[in-house]
Amino acid sequence: MSDAKISRIAVLGLGNVGELAATLLQGSGFSVTGVDIAPPNHAVPFAVASASAASKKELTKVLKDQQAVLSCLPYHLNEAVARLACELDLHYFDLTEDVATKEVIIELARRSGKLMAPQCGLAPGFVGIVGAHLAEQFSTIRSIKLRVGALPQHPTGLLAYSFN
């Protein structure tokens, strides 16, 4: 794996989460290209490209000059994006919580010379960061349990809510 610092990153999917991620990355010194099939019609602080996540040809054109890709797309699109990132020798990050997709990406990581990091979203991603920060506040810790609320695909119970 190269020690070259990542400076160019594409953020796929410019919904609320993707646009925020792209804005924060740009503000942190990265050169960001936001990619969406329907780019925002308002000003954003990063370059924008139009491409369909379903089109390998369109994505390849946008990603070929990048060093990394952050997928903020629906989970069912991430496997194809991760495979393309591996082909193009790009670092890969996503926000998915889908176990099957994560397993495919872990297998791709074994062949890739780049970082392939699924599940960088709320849980386990952000929750792990919060847990580590909280742990630093104590001299010793026996255990940490963090719970994340989720909207299940098949809601049950009075609240139609679940804890992961």
Language model regions located:
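Rossmann-fold NAD(P)-binding glycine/threonine-rich loop
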Residues: 95-118
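Conserved Rossmann-fold cofactor-binding substructure of NAD(P)-dependent oxidoreductases
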Residues: 53-65
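Glycine-rich Rossmann-fold phosphate-binding loop(s) that bind the pyrophosphate
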Residues: 14-15
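Rossmann-like dinucleotide-binding core of oxidoreductases
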Residues: 114-164
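NAD(P)-binding Rossmann-fold cofactor-contacting core
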Residues: 29-44
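N-terminal Rossmann-fold NAD(P) dinucleotide-binding loop
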Residues: 18-19
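Beta-loop-alpha module in the N-terminal Rossmann-like domain of NAD(P)-dependent dehydrogenases
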Residues: 68-85, 98-100
